[in-house]
Each structure stands twice: as structure tokens, then as C-alpha cells.
Curated annotation (Swiss-Prot):
May play a role in the control of the eukaryotic cell cycle. GO terms for biological process: cell division; regulation of mitotic cell cycle. It catalyses: L-seryl-[protein] + ATP = O-phospho-L-seryl-[protein] + ADP + H(+); L-threonyl-[protein] + ATP = O-phospho-L-threonyl-[protein] + ADP + H(+). GO terms for molecular function: ATP binding; cyclin-dependent protein serine/threonine kinase activity; protein serine kinase activity. InterPro entries: CDK, Kinase-like_dom_sf, Prot_kinase_dom, Ser/Thr_kinase_AS. The active site is at D138 (proton acceptor). This is Probable cell division protein kinase ECU11_1290. It comes from Encephalitozoon cuniculi (strain GB-M1) (Microsporidian parasite). Its main location: nucleus. SUPFAM superfamilies: Protein kinase-like (PK-like) (SSF56112). Residues 13-294 form the Protein kinase domain.
Length: 315
């Protein structure tokens, strides 16, 4: 940041290549001219940067969170720079090598040791984030970035916000969205992130999304077919306005046990707890770190380094 509150210029950076693109902006690999350090540079999509009140709250929120949260498993922001055009801004961030979505797409099932190690790092980042009173609200493989050494960074905080008593239910990418949000709850906490963790861990183990719905009703149907149909007791004390409109399927068998028993009791129990219908029964990030699934998962397995190396540059 320049004196007087002005941002530094994009001219301080040299573009290397485009890493990825999305509705909220493109991401480039860049090199800073003054010291040759490599960063990721996220261009803020001009059509989505601004609302009727000026600069979009999504971008303000992401910058503020990343500037004040410092943890080895959370993406770090270096600075915000301005482009050559009016209202053209970029976020300069730590540069990672690939993301979990690319890894799963490339190799399919991730080995148990690698899955446990990545889960451990994800929980550490969430423990810190939740301890600061912040919910991510959009955890998914494409927002989990990886380094060549197996290091993990939780990224994309555009939907993150401080925990409040009343929040919008238009959050979390559909496949990773918890059942209470699908059923209309506007009162939730960090437990929504833990459901998403369960979906991500299940995806690492199976090599494909475990709840890939094509719409909200199909998503609920897939949840019921995997986990069974919830009872009134599962949601006692919760305000879920859409639950009364859901028709109980006539006949079906929940497939979770058959789908996950091959991964062992610790893994199956861990994922099943995270996918509890009652959000109050899901383990916290801190409790998850004490579970048998991630116990002794502090050392990066060589297989993960090999996998990330093969996928480097795929984001």
C-alpha cells in the first residue's frame, strides 16, 4: 500500500501464466519485479466487484479476512494492487502448486495415508478459523490448495463471515451443502463447514464426489439414499421450514455402510459423524483432530508428494 492509502500498481508484477478462471475472477501466476518472488494474482471480475453501494462486500470480506488471519493452513494475502484501468483491482496471494479437485480428477482415489494427512491439515486450519469466530461457508476440493511438499492451504474466503445468529442460506456449493441449509435453516454455525469436510474426505477416499446432486431436491434425495431418512428426533429444536415438505421415499436402503466399510472403521465412523443430520452432533475441528482417523497423521507421506508433483500446474 502506498502512502496516502493508494494501492501499489500491477506494473510491479510480471505475468507468467493464467492459473485458473471463475465467475468471481481469473487467477494468474506472476513474478514481482523487485525481488523475483512468485505469487498468485487474482483479478477481481469488474462485473461482480461492485454493487449499488460501491465495492462488493464479497471482495472486502475476503481481503479483510485474509489480511488478518495468519495460519500455515490458510492462504495468505500479500497485498491488493490496482490495474491500469479505472476500478481494476487484483489480490496478490501466496502461490500454490495445485488444488485438491485437480488431484482427485487426475489420480482418482487418494491413498489412506495421504487422505489422513490432508484431513489433519484441513482441520488445523478450520480450528484456527473457527476459533477466530469465522465460518468459511464454501469448503470444497477446488478451494483446498496444495503445495509440492504436501502442504495444504484453505482458500477462497469470498463467502466467509463472522458467526452470527442469523445468516443467509444461499451458501456452500451444492454438493458440499449441509442438509440443514437445504432444508431452509438460517441459523447455523461452524458445523456447516464440518459437513463439507465430511464430503471432501469421502471424495478423497472414493475418488469422486459422494453427493453430486443436480439440484436441491436431487441433492436431498442423494443424501437420504446415502445416509437414510431423518426422523423428527434428528432435527428436534431446529427450525427447518422445508422439512415438512419432504416426502419420505417408499423403499430404499441407506448405502453408506456398504460404500465406506472397505476404508475401515475409523474412516467410516469419522465421515459418518461429520454427515450427522443434527449439526450439534458433528465433531468440531478440534475434536476431529483427536479422532482415530487423523491420529499420528502429522508426517507427509511420500505418495502425496509424488501425486502433487504430477499434478503441479493443473489449477
Amino acid at each position: 500500500m502506498r502512502s496516502g492509502g493508494r494501492c501499489n500498481s500491477i506494473e510491479n508484477y510480471e505475468k507468467v501464466c493464467r492459473i485458473s478462471s471463475g465467475s468471481f475472477g481469473n487467477v494468474y501466476r506472476v513474478r514481482r519485479k523487485t525481488d523475483n518472488r512468485v505469487f498468485a494474482l487474482k483479478r477481481m471480475n469488474p462485473s461482480m466487484c461492485y454493487d449499488t453501494n460501491g465495492f462488493s462486500i464479497l471482495y472486502i470480506r475476503e481481503v479483510m479476512i485474509l489480511k488478518h488471519i495468519r495460519h500455515r493452513n490458510i492462504m495468505e494475502i500479500e497485498e491488493v494492487v490496482e490495474g491500469c484501468e479505472i476500478n481494476d483491482f487484483f489480490i496478490v496471494m501466496e502461490c500454490c502448486d495445485t488444488d485438491l479437485r485437480s488431484v482427485i480428477h487426475s489420480v482418482g482415489k487418494i491413498g489412506m495415508k495421504a487422505a489422513r494427512f490432508l484431513t489433519c491439515q484441513m482441520l488445523k486450519g478450520l480450528k484456527f478459523l473457527h476459533g477466530a469466530g469465522i465460518v468459511h461457508r464454501d469448503l470444497k476440493p477446488s478451494n483446498i490448495l496444495l503445495m509440492r511438499d504436501g502442504g495444504l492451504r484453505i482458500a477462497d474466503f469470498g463467502l466467509a463471515r463472522a458467526i452470527e445468529s442469523q445468516m443467509t442460506n444461499l451458501v456452500v456449493t451444492l454438493w458440499y451443502r449441509p442438509i440443514e441449509i437445504l432444508l431452509g435453516s438460517e441459523t447455523y454455525d461452524e458445523s456447516i463447514d464440518m459437513w463439507s469436510v465430511g464430503c471432501v474426505v469421502g471424495e478423497m477416499l472414493r475418488g469422486e464426489p459422494i453427493l453430486a446432486g443436480e439440484g436441491e431436491m436431487d441433492q436431498l434425495d442423494r443424501i437420504f439414499r446415502l445416509l437414510g431418512y431423518p426422523t423428527d428426533a434428528d432435527f428436534e429444536g431446529l427450525d427447518l421450514p422445508h422439512f415438512k415438505n419432504i416426502r419420505r421415499p417408499s423403499t430404499f436402503e441407506a448405502s453408506f455402510e456398504g460404500d465406506f466399510e472397505c476404508y475401515g472403521e475409523e474412516a467410516a465412523s469419522f465421515v459418518r459423524n461429520l454427515l450427522s443430520f443434527d449439526p450439534r452432533k458433528r465433531c468440531t475441528a478440534s475434536q476431529g483432530l483427536c479422532s482415530g482417523f487423523v491420529a499420528d497423521a502429522e508426517e507427509c507421506p511420500g505418495e502425496l508428494v509424488d501425486i502433487v508433483g504430477r499434478c503441479t500446474g493443473d489449477i
